Amino acid sequence: MTGSHRQNGHREVLYIIACGSPLARDVGRLVELAQQDGWDVCVVTTPDGAKFVDRTAVARQTGHPVRTHYKNPGDPDVLPPADAMIVCPATVNTVNKWAAGITDTLALGLLVEAQGRGVPLVAVPYTNAAMATHPALQAGLARLTEWGVHVLFGDDVVPLHPPGTGERHQHTFPWARTLATLRPGCKEGPLVNASGSKGAPS
């Protein structure tokens, strides 16, 4: 283990929230790295994220069921409370809704509540160059950053690509860097916007 994610002898719990992107097929790689860092990992998907994630394989890997939908009234919680959350891959849809406080999916409800509880949050958008320039996304990322969410985004994370070519760039995705933001003493830089400049988008 390279991390020290333990409290009172128990492993701290990390939620990995996977959104609807082909990159979500590889979420098991992030799970493995997080487990090596000492986390007890749970995976939550958005409804579209569930289309890409092998739920059976991930449940076997984590020891927890993969959740997508709100539970029914009276049903018990099947996941332990989160000590930190990583949204990876984060889609434009989820970022925009999150920044607006919308909670129409389990993933968004968990994120909005976690922000109010002061849970450390990391967002790693994965999108194409055209969508990355949309004013709503730029404003949403700036708002999340202002609220204390650690956003990793831009050409120094994953080079932004033309529409329809995302799967060709998945092999370059820096899974380890994504997780490193939660390590004690991490000095990751500020958000990088779609143009590649430092600081929150304007």
For each predicted feature, which ranges?
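A cross-family phosphate/adenosyl-ligand binding-site feature
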Residues: 1-202
